[in-house]
Design a protein with these regions (language model features):
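Domain-level signal for Mg2+-assisted phosphodiester chemistry and nucleotide/NA-binding surfaces
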Residues: 1-99, 732, 746, 759
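Conserved beta-strand -> loop -> alpha-helix junction used to position metal-binding or nucleic-acid-contacting
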Residues: 5-10, 128-131, 135-163, 389-406, ...
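Extended two-metal-dependent nuclease catalytic cores across DNA- and RNA-processing enzymes
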Residues: 22-24, 73-253
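Conserved DEDDh/DEDDy metal-dependent 3′-5′ exonuclease domain
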Residues: 51, 105-107, 131, 303-305, ...
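Conserved "right-hand" nucleotidyltransferase catalytic core of DNA-directed polymerases
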Residues: 234-355, 436-610, 629, 639, ...
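Function-dense linear segments that define catalytic or interfacial modules
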Residues: 398-427, 434-436, 590-675
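Conserved catalytic core of nucleic-acid polymerases
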Residues: 473, 585-586, 590-593, 668-801, ...
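C-terminal polymerase-core module
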Residues: 492-499, 503, 507-554, 722-770, ...
Length: 857
């Protein structure tokens, strides 16, 4: 028999501190639960146990506290974020069939010791999973400790058996008690002997065997005079430490074989709880997929009617709820295959209508129909492919879910119905979520209203989905031949840089793509500074190389990497996704970024490089079709203008209103000098501070950005905050308000939950403060450009123009316009982008036209 015993408090603690804070949409912490269950799955795979016990401490004092008042007196209490998760974790373990073990007056360590001793008596194998090295004293021929440790900055489970203990410490496992009695244990406040550390304690135990043996040989010349003095002075404390540090093996718990066999638990309740905690990924990993969650209390005992499955009427009318049943994947040999394809369905009253594409087309642009849907984007695509616009769609649940919880990694109906506890109106075996759609949509609409996000939803996010679908359908024309020729040029540059690298290293076989070879060359062979060791050798990440850019070899390495990325990601990447029409049809992602920003993929056009001359040339291959031009409108310093408006800082506002160079004006204000005396260096510093202040950068980060000492950067920051007190006041108030309510908002009401602000961990809390400073500004900028996109798109349609909005990248919009409409398109872009909001500082755009993106930008 193989028994796995988990030190519950220790592993939960490891999981909590090892994973960033995770919360549900209603603010419940889940990171410790998620991490613990992942560790449990790994342990089950590694040990293949027949039985599993999870030991937990109780809050009550133990016999050790009664023996010594100072025992664990220096320990901080459990963080509140972790304490909230512990009862839920125990409930979940019980539902999964795992038995938890506690004993009043005893510690989890003693439970581990007692179960290990029982296994040894039966000659059964016992595995102890813990992060506490105290348990190493329990290692024996039948007991192995699986020690959760951090090795070279990474979490790792280290297997400790008798041989491993002997190799690491040079003693037997039980002798570790003797070591602890001498050196003490600061974490448990076990005193030990003054002046005796681990190295000395190990030497003494290796030579004299036990604590008693040390005192029997107290006059041995191996023991130095000062050590002898301390040993004699602290003899009673050493004996006490021995008793405190010894894990007991007689805790009053059940140790009979079979006691900890994994039971049935309550799988339906486990599914319900995992869904409620929004830890959906673990449901299949625990073999729970296909198990219906326990019904909410209000549904318990209620008989629900089975829905009718019917074909869509030839002349549909009224309101339908439309959603899709996800595809079911499976294995065919080693290949992933689709066992059941995605399928759409509509719900009206208690009837479910399976939908073919032809049915969808009849619904999507039907004056007699209104559609409340989940995930409008693919439906708009289907409508537009059929020559329509999807005008029947009036609401999208996926967009609502995103606004209500932007931190979620995905949005699925089954998960949302669980987290919202949506009541079922009927049952439907073929479409399990269909009966809960109405209540889910109703609850989401109510929450959108309660959060004050109706305007954000109705004026920006919902209409934007149609705009993005049209942009994807239209696509961007590219010069395929030009991209191919650019690739040839790029590869030539790569070969030349590689040749220089080989000359500088003196090795034609040197591979700059090998982190190992590069690290050894830079730090072992050449002896360059700033080397950092990782588990795999020398670090050669971008930050390390940037700090060494002044060395010719490193400059060439950075150049080589940049050219490689250009070639693989953009040249080769773009060529792969050019459609038959010669256009790239990138997919715009509306529900991914927590700040509200858009992203794109297939390909990602948001990161087209512009900072290098060679990289910016790529824009030349995004072109207008014959007879047309690209009209590019780019917001000028939109985030700084929003900062000026949102903080109410008069100097910053006046600088913009006067048309001044904001960075030069800032430098003049900070240093108390006329603008004409501001040097380029001072302007650069002011620019870095202007943007850095929004991102919560401190003196250290700023120093790296502008190439000054940390002390100088700190002085810059202090001067800035003194010169712009309203900016400082706004930042402080934003953080305070966010801590009070748990979120920050943009000027349009978009919320971003920040559970990090409640963390007891300084680094996590500081990260939350940076996000609190930045999100209202960056998020408002995202909202503004989205609103501008909606207004530009609608106006182009309303004025029946051929011009089409085809692309957005960061703060710019691009329209492909016939030459005869170019001037009008530019006017519309400027008017709608600058006029979509009225702030204390007017928004400003730079608008240009050209045959290609580079020329237009």
């Amino acid at each position: 028999m193989r028994l796995l015993v988990i030190d519950g408090n220790s592993i939960a603690n490891r999981a909590f501190f090892g994973i960033k804070l995770l919360t549900t949409k209603d603010g419940r912490y889940t990171n410790a639960i998620y991490g613990f269950l992942n560790i449990l799955l790994s342990l089950l795979k590694e040990c293949e146990p027949d039985e599993v016990a999870v030991a937990f401490d109780l809050k009550a004092p133990t016999f050790r506290h009664k023996m010594y008042d100072g025992y664990k007196a220096t320990r901080h209490g459990m963080p509140e974020e972790l304490a909230q998760q512990m009862p839920v974790l125990k409930e979940l373990l019980a539902d999964l069939g795992y038995r938890t073990v506690t004993a009043e007056g005893w510690e989890a360590d003693d439970i581990l010791g007692t179960l290990a001793a029982a296994c040894a008596a039966r000659k059964d194998d016992c595995f102890l999973a813990t992060g506490d090295r105290d348990s190493l004293q329990l290692v024996s021929d039948t007991t192995t400790v699986l020690l959760a440790a951090t090795v070279m900055g990474r979490s790792k489970t280290v297997t400790m058996d008798v041989d491993a203990i002997q190799e690491k410490y040079g003693i037997q496992p039980r002798q570790l008690i003797e070591v602890k009695s001498l050196m003490g244990d600061a974490s448990d406040n076990i005193p030990g002997v003054k002046g005796i550390g681990e190295k000395t304690a190990l030497t003494l135990v290796q030579n004299f065997g036990t604590l008693e043996g040390v005192y029997e040989h107290i006059d041995d010349k191996l023991i130095k005079p000062k050590q002898r003095e301390h040993l004699l002075e602290c003899r009673e404390m050493a004996q006490l430490s021995h008793t405190l540090g010894t894990i007991r093996t007689d805790a009053p718990i059940d140790t009979a074989e079979g006691t900890y066999a994994v039971g049935e638990g309550n799988k339906a309740e486990a599914v319900r709880l995992l869904q409620e905690l929004e830890i959906h990924s673990l449901i299949p990993r625990f073999g729970l997929d296909g198990i219906a969650p326990a019904a909410p209390e209000e549904e318990d005992g209620i008989e629900l009617a089975e829905a009718e499955l019917e074909a869509l009427p030839l002349t549909p009318s009224g309101t339908y709820l439309v959603a899709s049943r996800p595809a079911v994947m499976g294995k065919q040999g080693t290949r992933n295959v689709v066992l059941q394809p995605e399928s759409w369905y509509a719900v009206q009253d208690c009837t479910v209508y399976p939908l073919e594409d032809a049915d969808l087309v009849r619904l999507l642009d039907n004056a007699d129909v209104t559609l409340e849907v989940f995930n409008a984007a693919p439906l708009y695509a289907k409508a537009m492919a059929a020559g329509g616009w999807g005008s029947s769609i009036v609401w999208d649940g996926k967009l609502a879910a995103y606004l209500l919880d932007a931190s979620a990694s995905k949005y699925q109906i089954s998960e949302l119905t669980a987290s919202y506890r949506a009541a079922a109106a009927f049952t439907c075996a073929d479409y399990p979520d269909a009966g809960r759609l109405a209540d889910l949509f109703c609850k989401m609409k109510a929450e959108i209203t309660a959060c004050g996000e109706d305007s954000l939803y109705n004026e920006i996010e919902f209409p934007l989905a149609q705009v993005l679908a049209d942009m994807t359908r239209t696509g961007v024309l590219v010069d395929k031949d030009g991209i191919e020729q650019f690739g040839v040029k790029l590869r030539t540059e790569l070969e030349q840089v590689l040749g220089r690298i080989h000359m500088e290293t003196g090795s034609a076989s040197f591979n700059p793509n090998s982190p190992k070879q590069l690290g050894e060359m830079l730090f072992d062979t050449m002896g360059l500074p700033h080397g950092k060791k990782t588990q795999r050798g020398w670090s050669t990440d971008a930050e390390t190389l940037e700090s060494l850019r002044d060395y010719p070899l490193v400059e060439d390495i950075l150049q080589y990497r940049a050219y490689q990325k250009l070639n693989s990601t953009y040249v080769e990447g773009l060529l792969k996704v050019i459609g038959e029409d010669g256009r790239i049809h990138s997919t715009f992602n509306q529900t991914e970024a927590r700040t509200g920003r858009l992203s794109s993929d297939n390909p990602n056009l948001q990161n087209i490089p512009i900072r290098t001359e060679l990289g910016s040339q790529l824009r030349a291959y995004f072109i207008a079709k014959p007879g047309c031009v690209l009209v590019d409108a780019d917001y000028s310093q939109i985030e700084l203008r929003i900062l000026a408006h949102i903080t109410g800082d008069e100097h910053m506002q006046q600088a913009f209103l006067n048309g001044e160079d904001i960075h030069r004006s800032t430098a003049a204000k900070i240093y108390g000098i006329p603008q004409e005396e501001v040097t380029s260096r001072l302007r650069s510093s002011a620019k870095a501070i202007n943007f850095g202040i929004m991102y919560g950068k401190g003196a250290y980060s700023l120093a790296k950005d502008i190439g000054v000492t940390v002390k100088e950067a700190d002085a810059f920051l202090k001067n800035y905050l003194a010169a712009f007190p309203k900016v400082s006041g706004y930042m402080d108030k934003t953080i305070a308000d966010a801590k009070a309510c748990g979120y920050v908002s943009t000027l349009f009401g978009r919320r971003r939950a920040l559970p990090e602000l409640a963390s007891s961990n300084f680094n996590v809390r500081s990260s939350g403060e940076r996000m609190a400073r930045n999100t209202p500004i960056q998020g408002t900028a995202a909202d503004v450009i989205k609103l501008a996109m909606v207004r530009v798109w609608k106006r182009l349609r309303n004025e029946k123009m051929e011009s089409r909005l085809i692309l957005t990248v960061n703060d710019e919009l691009i329209v492909e316009a016939p030459q005869t409409e170019a001037e009008k398109a530019a006017q519309i872009l400027r008017e709608e982008m600058e006029g979509c909001v009225q702030y204390a500082v007017p928004l400003s755009t730079d608008v240009h036209a050209g045959k290609n993106w580079l020329e237009a930008h």
